[in-house]
Each structure stands twice: as C-alpha cells, then as structure tokens.
Amino acid sequence: MIAEERIREKVYRLKATYALRSVSILGSYAEGRATENSDIDLLVEFEQPTVSLLKLNSLKYDLEDTLGIPIDVIHAPLPAGSMIRPSKIVRIL
C-alpha cells in the first residue's frame, strides 16, 4: 500500500503539466481498506472543463509509472445520477 503523502507529492508534481484544479482519492484508499493488490481511484478536476481522452490517459500512465501501481482516473465533477457514489473522498490537491 502506498502512503497518501506519496500520492499527494506525485500528483502535485504533475499539477502544472496537466493543469489540475483538484484531485481526490476515492475507493479503498480513501476508506482505509486498501491492500497490496488495490488500485488507486482518483477523481480529477482540470482547469478546463473539457479534457481529451489522450490527456486523461497520459495522466493515468504518468501516475502509474511514478507510483508503480494501477490508477483509475475519473473526470470530475461527477454527473448527477452517476453510478459512482463514493462513501468517502479524500482531497489531496
């Protein structure tokens, strides 16, 4: 399991590159039940409301390369009626 502070540091280093407005952790990492097999679920809001799939995937792969763990990047804000309903959100940026 990766410490929240390490995730925060890596995300902060990519803030300018990807024009990140906010990043939050969801899922097992946010709920404190992550295991060594868990991925990291990130809810990401960009400075621009519209972001290309290429940019989302680039962010995902940059984070996976630096953290060495699978990452799921979810574009924020979540739309009304979204199937994703996190029980806990931990803002890291």
Model-identified regions with their sequence ranges:
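Structural signature of the urease/amidohydrolase superfamily beta/alpha-barrel
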Residues: D39-D41
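Short hydrophobic/aromatic beta-strand micro-patches
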Residues: L43-E45
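Catalytic core of pol beta-like nucleotidyltransferases
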Residues: M1-S22, A30-E36, E47-L93
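Conserved histidines in hydrophobic membrane contexts and catalytic metal-binding motifs
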Residues: I25
